[in-house]
Amino acid sequence: MSQNTLKVHDLNEDAEFDENGVEVFDEKALVEQEPSDNDLAEEELLSQGATQRVLDATQLYLGEIGYSPLLTAEEEVYFARRALRGDVASRRRMIESNLRLVVKIARRYGNRGLALLDLIEEGNLGLIRAVEKFDPERGFRFSTYATWWIRQTIERAIMNQTRTIRLPIHIVKELNVYLRTARELSHKLDHEPSAEEIAEQLDKPVDDVSRMLRLNERITSVDTPLGGDSEKALLDILADEKENGPEDTTQDDDMKQSIVKWLFELNAKQREVLARRFGLLGYEAATLEDVGREIGLTRERVRQIQVEGLRRLREILQTQGLNIEALFRE
């Protein structure tokens, strides 16, 4: 997929913010998205008669919350009023009766970089906040009001925890415009839209769209497990660009053999100095001082012999169309 093709992530797309970057509660939006009792009933994760619990932590949690009955509209008003007056038991009842709503909403945010249990945990924080702020006299059902808070906490967690670099609120708002448009186009075009298609839809410069889309890219750790039955991490399958392949190794061996052959076209002193200086013919690479100490010559004399040897070797290589600088660094 090209760099200008978008993976659609609709994080926090409908949120409004004040000048301090705090979400503003939108009552009009809630009227449009209020879930019905039938929807909640259809989305119940476990039946009341389910008794078998599996070892999986998620299923265990879902099993536990399945025993909390939903509240009627009258019960919501009753417990909400008492919770506002500081009644702890009523507050707990409001929370426990709506935990399944959190799971229902959290499941919509799968494959966004956070595990389901993490999404549920964040959503529960939003639920608690909703219980603390809910005013039953406003005329909304609690599920409507709580949905807004649950979404905000989940979306904020995804935005903050799945990004290596946090984005400013105003950038997130602008990015969400592109993401919402991209999602709409993906349904209309039946494929993930390119930056050019998004730019045309929004009447924006393509460069601006491409820049914003790059902000939505995820950074993946090389230690990330591949998943499935494999125990390998991403690092285990990445190619090492610095490591020579078999064909490079063969070429290196051929080059070494050629260098040895060319060295033996020099006189004995030049051959020994170059071999010691550059780690050839079984020698370890050494400094001018070390070479002089080993063969009983001064540093300056070793340097002169090296220059003479390289000059002669350059002449030999030039006759074969080769460059000595590719072999040695003076």
UniProtKB/Swiss-Prot annotation:
Question: Known InterPro entries for this protein?
Answer: RNA_pol_sigma-70_dom (IPR014284), RNA_pol_sigma70 (IPR000943), RNA_pol_sigma70_r1_2 (IPR009042), RNA_pol_sigma70_r2 (IPR007627), RNA_pol_sigma70_r3 (IPR007624), RNA_pol_sigma70_r4 (IPR007630), RNA_pol_sigma_r2 (IPR013325), RNA_pol_sigma_r3/r4-like (IPR013324)
Where the protein is mainly located, per its record? Answer: cytoplasm
Provide this UniProt record's keywords sorted from A to Z: Cytoplasm, DNA-binding, Sigma factor, Stress response, Transcription, Transcription regulation
Description of the deletion phenotype: Stationary phase cells lose resistance to killing by endoribonuclease MazF.
Keyword match Translocase: no
Q: Which GO terms describe its biological process?
A: DNA-templated transcription initiation; negative regulation of DNA-templated transcription; regulation of DNA-templated transcription initiation; response to stress
Stretches that traverse the bilayer: none
Localization: Cytoplasm
Q: Where is this motif: Interaction with polymerase core subunit RpoC?
A: 118-121
Region annotated Sigma-70 factor domain-3, chain positions = 174-249
Q: Which GO molecular function, any one, fits this protein according to its record?
A: bacterial-type RNA polymerase core enzyme binding
Cellular component (GO) terms are: cytoplasm; cytosolic DNA-directed RNA polymerase complex; sigma factor antagonist complex
Region feature Sigma-70 factor domain-2, mapped onto this chain: 94-164
- Stretch list, region Sigma-70 factor domain-1: 56-89
Q: What induces it?
A: Subject to complex regulation at multiple levels (transcription, translation, regulation of activity and degradation). Transcription is induced during entry into stationary phase and in response to different stresses. Transcription is repressed by antitoxin MqsA. mRNA stability is regulated by small RNA regulators and various proteins such as Hfq, CsdA, CspC and CspE. Finally, the cellular level of RpoS is regulated by proteolysis via RssB and the ClpXP protease.
Instruction: Cite the SUPFAM superfamilies for this sequence.
Output: Sigma2 domain of RNA polymerase sigma factors, Sigma3 and sigma4 domains of RNA polymerase sigma factors
Q: Which domain of life is it from?
A: Bacteria
Keyword Transcription attributed: yes
Q: Which family does it belong to?
A: Belongs to the sigma-70 factor family. RpoS subfamily.
User: What's the stated role of this polypeptide?
Assistant: Sigma factors are initiation factors that promote the attachment of RNA polymerase to specific initiation sites and are then released. This sigma factor is the master transcriptional regulator of the stationary phase and the general stress response. Controls, positively or negatively, the expression of several hundred genes, which are mainly involved in metabolism, transport, regulation and stress management. Protects stationary phase cells from killing induced by endoribonuclease MazF.
The record, for HAMAP family, names: Sigma70_RpoS
Quaternary structure, from the entry? Interacts with the RNA polymerase core enzyme and RssB.
In the record's own words, the domains note is:
The sigma-70 factor domain-2 mediates sequence-specific interaction with the -10 element in promoter DNA, and plays an important role in melting the double-stranded DNA and the formation of the transcription bubble. The sigma-70 factor domain-2 mediates interaction with the RNA polymerase subunits RpoB and RpoC. The sigma-70 factor domain-4 contains a helix-turn-helix (H-T-H) motif that mediates interaction with the -35 element in promoter DNA. The domain also mediates interaction with the RNA polymerase subunit RpoA.
User: Matching NCBIfam families, A to Z?
Assistant: PRK05657.1, rpoS_proteo, sigma70-ECF
Q: What is this protein called?
A: RNA polymerase sigma factor RpoS
